[in-house]
Amino acid sequence: MWSVRLYPLALTLLFQCVSPAAARPSGCVDDVEVVQEIGSKEIQAPVVRFEISLTTQSIDAAGIGFREAIFINDAFIGPTLYAKQGDRIEFVVHNYMQQDTSIHFHGIDQRSTPWSDGVPGLTQSQIRPGASFLYNWTAHDAGTYFYHSHAKSQMMDGLYGAVVIAPDDEAPRPFHLISSGEADQAAMLAAEKLMRPIFVSDWSQYTSAEYHGIQHAANIDFSCMDSILVQGVGSQYCLSEEELDDMTNPIVLQLLKELAGGHMTPKGCIPPLQMFNGDFELHLENVPELAYNKCKGGQSSKGNYTIDVDTSIGWAALTFVNPGGLYPLQLSIDSHELYVYAVDGQYVYPIVADRVLVNTGSRISVMIKLDQEKARHVVRVANDYLNQILGGFAELAYDGATNAPKHPHPKTNYGGKLISSEMVSFVPEDSSPYPALRPAQSADSTFKLRLKKLGQPYRAYEWTQTGSLGYNISHEHDDPPLLLQNVEDVPATELTLKTQIGDWVDLVLVTAGPFAQAHPMHKHGNKVFLIGSGSGSFPWESVEEAIPHLPEGTFNFQDPPYLDTFNTVEMEGQANDTWTAVRYKAEYAGAWLFHCHVQTHLSGGMGMVVLDGVDAWPEVPLAYQEWNGFEPPALS
């Protein structure tokens, strides 16, 4: 085993988000459009070395009992990697657990280092117990990203931490679109240099292995969590039947009345009914009482997490990151508007909102004007899916205040619903990158995908992204990894797409009903433009063919969202199916995973491989073919 050497991290807390860009939805301040090219210049810079040690320890994160979790450098939630745009990163992982692992850098494009993307069986072999691995990549694009395990569902056990890359000083920023005042702009610039990433996630009393074990034993699509964590701290709240009914979606409540006693379970979940699981033989006798029907209630010994802000600056900058296993989360702060200025590490034309949606895998950066009472203002976080009423809290403390505000003005209730119809919500798919960036007006190739449960004879928790085949989790153990194979010998299949370098590629994802749900999709290797969506099927062979048959404005080629994680469209009206179209340029050759970021969906098969640039396939360095990224020791 390679010896452990801990290097001091001399890193400054610098941060500002920039990257390509594109447009403005309603509610944005107008501005002269600036168009830039995809990609960022490389800057000569020193090496930043960052080391983490992984262990398994017990934690009671929500006051409902201890369970095993993954600790990074003896802490629950890993340390933040700070770097500057253009820095070369040496990220060393030491695995002291009794299980295999890997680390993926979510949103980092790995344009010249695909062997550091961290997907076992695809870009590397597993990091075995007692082994170490050196990831080596360049911080091409500024912004907030995060590192997390890509082995099994270890993210659900806490294996994640933030990556913050500061941009060039001359990078254009959108703060003048938030305020025309020079003092405000200077304050926002100062606030952004002190930006803090805040992790918000769902949490289960079960480890990821136990969670999947319940799915397998009961043959259900298990979706009932115990709490919401903010920066690793949370509580379990047990609401009354009346309170749950009041916050349950009316359609869901009516279905429950017709099918199963009329209410959510004591944990606020839709019970594991046949209707919602599909036509499978369920074994509900194998579902533990604590899984759905028993709410213990509890609070972390640390209480609610406190976000301290310095009012002398005038503004605060926060980036909310969702590494959760299942749920997109709605977030609001009492008495404060949220000025969204970056999404997925990418500046956007600012949008002012009362509530923001943080998808699993997404990062939402907000400016907050510190002009309210010096007090502890409540931060509210809640599940956005209809399947469970689940909320959590943190506190935004002005200058270390200990008092509650005299006249609080909440924006959302416990279930994440807006208090007033006049309030504004933000979703990442509403964003437009700043400065402007446009996709090509047509694509060189189109791939149509179909997201659905596999159905019989498969299990209730098995999914497909292609319509008929699932990406088996056993691929994590493929040896040699696909990237190290001769790409000419790898056939193009339903689960393996091939593109040519420089091509513009359309991916059209049809989400099958009934009850078509939104899936947070993440493509490794690059961001994508979300160019259109709609209800119903997509019978056309390409976007170009579809344009004459759909209403004007269905597609946006001028200023579409530019994201590394996007939601497919959920059920609309009476249509069973929905469709979502994204476009990207195959600029960076490599073997990239494209998958749903809901961990039970990915482990259940909702993934596939995209081999971009097969005509310019990279040569993998010998260190990554043989020695986990390290150079072999010199022989004397």
Swiss-Prot record:
Keyword entries, A-Z: Copper, Glycoprotein, Metal-binding, Oxidoreductase, Repeat, Signal
Function: Multicopper oxidase; part of the gene cluster that mediates the biosynthesis of cercosporin, a light-activated, non-host-selective toxin. The perylenequinone chromophore of cercosporin absorbs light energy to attain an electronically-activated triplet state and produces active oxygen species such as the hydroxyl radical, superoxide, hydrogen peroxide or singlet oxygen upon reaction with oxygen molecules. These reactive oxygen species cause damage to various cellular components including lipids, proteins and nucleic acids.
GO MF annotation, one: copper ion binding
Pathway(s) annotated for this protein in UniProt: Mycotoxin biosynthesis
Positions of the Plastocyanin-like domain: 62-168, 318-381, 486-613
Record: residues binding Cu cation 3: 150, 524, 595
Organism encoding this protein: Cercospora beticola
Statement: the UniProt record of this protein carries the keyword Repeat: yes
Binding site for Cu cation 1: 104, 522
Signal peptide: 1-23
Pfam families: Cu-oxidase (PF00394), Cu-oxidase_2 (PF07731), Cu-oxidase_3 (PF07732)
The gene coding this protein: CTB12
UniProt family annotation: Belongs to the multicopper oxidase family.
Annotated Cu cation 4 binding sites: 519, 596, 601
Domain of life: Eukaryota
Stated name of the protein: Multicopper oxidase CTB12
Binding-site residues, Cu cation 2: 106, 148, 597
Known EC number: 1.-.-.-
Gene ablation phenotype (knockout): Abolishes the production of cercosporin.
Glycosylation sites: 136, 304, 472, 576
UniProt xrefs under InterPro entries: Cu-oxidase-like_N, Cu-oxidase_2nd, Cu-oxidase_C, Cu-oxidase_fam, Cu_oxidase_CS, Cu_oxidase_Cu_BS, Cupredoxin
Gene3D superfamilies reported in the protein's UniProt record: Cupredoxins - blue copper proteins
